[in-house]
Amino acid sequence: MAFRPLHDRILVRRVESEEKTKGGIIIPDTAKEKPQEGEVLAVGPGARGEQGQIQPLDVKVGDRILFGKWSGTEIKIDGEDLLIMKESDVMGIIEARAAEKIAA
């Protein structure tokens, strides 16, 4: 991939959700909502502060994040559907321990 976000933008790949509910019901593609969880693939250098200095971003490449349903702009890079969004669209970073509990 040859894409580098600018300023406070980040590049995100959606993380697909389970195809079955906990009760074993299979969810058809037509009933699925787009996931609001993703993995950060690239980050910009940061936003400029009032004094002109660059404020580094809190998110890093590899972070698993939650974002709003309508956040970001959908793009296609190398045939893969990705999102570009501002860091302010991110609601939070999923910590490793929390992600393990969700998966279990």
From Swiss-Prot:
The gene is groES5. Induction: By heat shock. GO terms for molecular function: ATP binding; metal ion binding; protein folding chaperone; protein-folding chaperone binding; unfolded protein binding. InterPro entries: Chaperonin_GroES (IPR020818), Chaperonin_GroES_sf (IPR037124), Chaprnonin_Cpn10_CS (IPR018369), GroES-like_sf (IPR011032). One of its GO terms (cellular component) is cytoplasm. Belongs to the GroES chaperonin family. Together with the chaperonin GroEL, plays an essential role in assisting protein folding. The GroEL-GroES system forms a nano-cage that allows encapsulation of the non-native substrate proteins and provides a physical environment optimized to promote and accelerate protein folding. GroES binds to the apical surface of the GroEL ring, thereby capping the opening of the GroEL channel. It comes from Rhizobium meliloti (strain 1021). Keywords: Chaperone, Cytoplasm, Plasmid, Stress response. HAMAP family: CH10. GO terms for biological process: chaperone cofactor-dependent protein refolding. Heptamer of 7 subunits arranged in a ring. Interacts with the chaperonin GroEL. It comes from the Bacteria. This is Co-chaperonin GroES 5. The lineage of its organism: Bacteria, Pseudomonadati, Pseudomonadota, Alphaproteobacteria, Hyphomicrobiales. It is found in: Cytoplasm.
